[in-house]
Amino acid sequence: MNNVIPLQNSPERVSLLPIAPGVDFATALSLRRMATSTGATPAYLLAPEVSALLFYMPDQRHHMLFATLWNTGMRIGEARMLTPESFDLDGVRPFVRILSEKVRARRGRPPKDEVRLVPLTDISYVRQMESWMITTRPRRREPLWAVTDETMRNWLKQAVRRAEADGVHFSIPVTPHTFRHSYIMHMLYHRQPRKVIQALAGHRDPRSMEVYTRVFALDMAATLAVPFTGDGRDAAEILRTLPPLK
């Protein structure tokens, strides 16, 4: 497992990893370090980090679960309710139907406001999901991941341990919910409108997006290059020529 770039030990190569058009990994990593230093911004992974972490999930069932969290931003409880029937992979615009966790305790057809559709825009992920379903042949209404939340967390911990044993380290704690934060940040990096991301993530309150967008406020401030230091001697000479204030 030595063909993954160590994420902290090769700065020259790391800086070349793309995050989004016009954004490199080194810059995004520095911005994340600044944004999360106060604890106000949720911890998130960048795209190369997610790719590396998925690499250390050789079990396809584990891999496809976390690839699904990454590609959709859904909550872990929502993922547990997914069935093959939830996915539409054959059309021109593949998508997944996500049921609100509130639906779990009810029977019958869920209300419209408790179902959301999320486009699957990564064709590689769509092909992987198709292949996995063909191989495993689950029943159409059978949950794809009928396991406990704790089991899912253990799968993730195993992958993190494999990565660390191979010299790949992550600078933030990684949990299943990290993939949701990572999805939202990835969409923001790709300049998707806030209201669109809010709808896809299932956030009812627009203010919930503010914890993510403040990262880009820091980025904007950092790139303005506003100078504050001047030549004190020259300033004093200029001020000396002015009449005294009355």
From Swiss-Prot:
One of this protein's Pfam families, by short name? Answer: Phage_integrase
InterPro entries listed in its UniProt record: DNA_brk_join_enz, Integrase-like_cat_sf, Integrase_catalytic, Resolvase_Rsv, Tyrosine_recombinase_XerCD
* Keyword Transport among record annotations: no
Q: Which residues form the active site?
A: 75, 102, 177, 180, 203, 212
Q: Which GO terms describe its biological process?
A: DNA integration; DNA recombination
Q: One MF term in GO for this entry?
A: DNA binding
Which keywords does this Swiss-Prot/TrEMBL entry list?
DNA integration, DNA recombination, Plasmid, Repressor, Transcription, Transcription regulation
Q: Which positions fall inside the Tyr recombinase domain?
A: 40-225
UniProt lists the family membership as follows: Belongs to the 'phage' integrase family.
Name of the protein in its database record: Probable site-specific recombinase
| Biological source species | Escherichia coli (strain K12)
